[in-house]
Each structure stands twice: as C-alpha cells, then as structure tokens.
Design a protein with these regions (language model features):
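Residue-level recognition of beta-strand microenvironments
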Residues: 19-21, 66, 83-86, 112
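Acidic, low-complexity mobile loops and tails
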Residues: 1-59, 92, 96-131
Length: 131
C-alpha cells in the first residue's frame, strides 16, 4: 500500500472516491487504492447526460473490472456539469491515472459544507491502514 498515491490537495470518502474542489465545482473520481483493488477496469456506467443531480453517499454509477463490479457512491451533492466521455471507450484511464485522466464527473456543489465530512489525505491513509 505504500506505493499507492493519495494527493494531499484532494478530499477522500470512506467508499474510496476522491474530490478536487475548485470554487463552487468539484471533480470526482476513485482513489488509487480503489483502482488497485479492482484490478483492470473494463467498463464504467456514469450519468452520461450532464445536468443530472448526485447526492452525497448515493449511487451515481457502476464500475466493472476483471475482478468485480462495484457501485460508485458520490462523495458530495450537486448537479453534474461535465462527464469524462473518454471513459466510455477507454475505462483503463482510471487504472493508469486515477487522479488525472481517470476523473469521472465535475459537479456544481449544492452543499459545500459536505466537504467537511470528507477525509484529508493523511486521514484517508490512516483509514486504509485500519481496514
């Protein structure tokens, strides 16, 4: 686990999603730990039509790997304003660069205070060690 990357400028959920907040918008993806546990990602289902809403701790999609299928839970609430269309044809971007090219959604925050419910990188690392 020591070789896994968890950037300090992001926030993390207990369900292994990350959030990058920029003003009133947030980018969402899954952590390096999550993609490592899943193995090779072969398919992802996201709300491809922007303008849908997501709610904190509720399902926003599914991710399928050679090992398993898992639900994606939103770490924050808001309106989807952008979806990473590249993941339709190349879901392996999530394995290759989970914090860069492997991002999933950009959301306009509806409740910025929810960010306070998420963990810092150090808190997330400690959480993973306690699993």
């Amino acid at each position: 686990m020591a070789s896994l990357n968890h950037p300090s400028d992001l926030k993390y959920s207990k369900t292994d999603e990350w959030v990058r907040v920029e003003g009133d918008q947030a980018t969402i993806g899954i952590t390096d730990y999550a993609q490592d546990q899943l193995g090779d990602i072969v398919y992802i289902e996201l709300p491809w039509d922007a303008s849908q809403s997501v709610s904190q701790e509720t399902k926003f999609g599914d991710i399928e790997s050679v090992k398993a299928t898992s639900e994606l839970l939103s770490p924050i609430s808001g309106e989807v304003i952008k979806v990473n269309e590249a993941l339709k044809d190349t879901p392996e971007l999530i394995n290759d660069k989970p914090y860069e090219d492997g991002w999933m959604l950009v959301v306009k925050l509806s409740n910025p205070g929810e960010i306070d419910n998420l963990m810092s990188a150090d808190q997330y690392k400690a959480y993973l060690q306690g699993r």
